């Protein structure tokens, strides 16, 4: 390409640039953090690729990041000799955003969040933060290994368009020049920039260089302004909590300190250091299938990759941090990581440490654990099914709300449940529903409330899947109160009385069955109900109504099954049927049971007509 070409930004990028320029102003200094981070990543990538291709690094110069200011021209230039980019990569990485990160970033900003600069790094759109302080940005880059001495120049004022042209470029790497706005001149001050680097980028292992002040002002000599050491390699006895908090924030772009951290150095058959953090807030993309991993893997302090599944199971995907080992080859691939003995050993030990730390938090700092559970409880429930080896440990960390709880807050443990079980109780009872309110108000609970039996109220979206695969806790099985018969609840006298009542209602049930033949499998007298006239149940091995709803919402095929209608023989509406079978009343009893399940009626208007008719 010989001539300069003008391109238009993707719509989302234009929106983002407008946001950067006009809204995100509370913490303007983060532009430098973002650009230095990009340069550091570029150097890490070159180090990694050069392990298998040493021709990529031209000469013997040290890989560094240089920051230069020109007060006369009002510019700041950040230069690295990292991997660089091709013209196609410049277009792809800067002109457009292929993933949905920007859209979600824009969508997530409400009035309170507009000034929250930390969201920038979380959504991977940091380059555009340049326009917070600059009214023009120029980027010149040349890909490492390119035989041509030509590079690509990208220029934009952030107003909808950008230009690309081919230019002479002797060195590989990337240089970003910011033309600083008139009212942002503070960032041309040498000490101001050094302070920002010290605050955000001190731990970056790539040396960050700035011109050293000389007495005569003529000699140009660069000095390293960051410590350029691996933070995690320091002795934890020399570190304060504030040091950990600052490192965590710079690593994750989180604006809140973590709940806790685990810093371990292991020496033996496998040598490694791990520094793992448990955040205080859930990330925005925790439920994204393709979310970026939170653990960074280093081999001999060289960044290798981020891969949560290789280093941490999915149910612990919220854990952030670094793992550095000398026992992996530097050219390890993502494929080799899977099943690698070193990685498997580190993973197993790391999981064990995290679970022990959570157990310790739950015991010694219950308030912190309550905060943790509010943010990550749903994810932890996945672990019961995914991590069979640690199932018992995870099960003890689970928290629930029950029919005896004062609120929807999940604070009850399975251990406490089992200890407080009634003498002849043989199961941990639970009910699943779409909402806490639906579970709390379910007619299925009536007999349990009457007999003072505790029931877990499950309304998280993972609960149905969890309990269906849970098995037992301390040899006690879990039992749904909406499935099958409730054996063991009735005394001998109650059983005998129920059998008598059932006989008395045989003819009523027979006539009801004819009316509801296409809608129910069976109708029977209930041992669950004390106040409500009716409810729906399913057989023990059939899919419950809540699971059916979940499957349908996911577009899955659901078996066509009919529920069982249970009626309360002591309710006035049901007693009426002994005198006269009223078809409208029978259908209303069924519709009421459907509604109490949280399911929409197929014909609500017809239901209203029947209700009005019965009232009149």
UniProtKB/Swiss-Prot annotation:
The listed locations are: Cytoplasm
Q: Which gene encodes it?
A: htpG
Report residue spans for region: B. Answer: 335-549
| Ranges where the record places region A | 1-334
From what organism does this protein derive?
Answer: Ruthia magnifica subsp. Calyptogena magnifica
Gene3D superfamilies reported for this sequence: 3.30.230.80, 3.40.50.11260, Heat shock protein 90, C-terminal domain, Histidine kinase-like ATPase, C-terminal domain
Q: Keywords of this protein's UniProt record, alphabetized? A: ATP-binding, Chaperone, Cytoplasm, Nucleotide-binding, Stress response
Spell out the PANTHER family in the cross-references. HEAT SHOCK PROTEIN 90 FAMILY MEMBER
Family classification: Belongs to the heat shock protein 90 family.
Give the UniProt entry's GO cellular component terms: cytoplasm
Task: Please identify the protein, giving its name as recorded.
Answer: Chaperone protein HtpG
- Which Gene Ontology terms cover its molecular function? ATP binding; ATP hydrolysis activity; ATP-dependent protein folding chaperone; unfolded protein binding
Protein purpose: Molecular chaperone. Has ATPase activity.
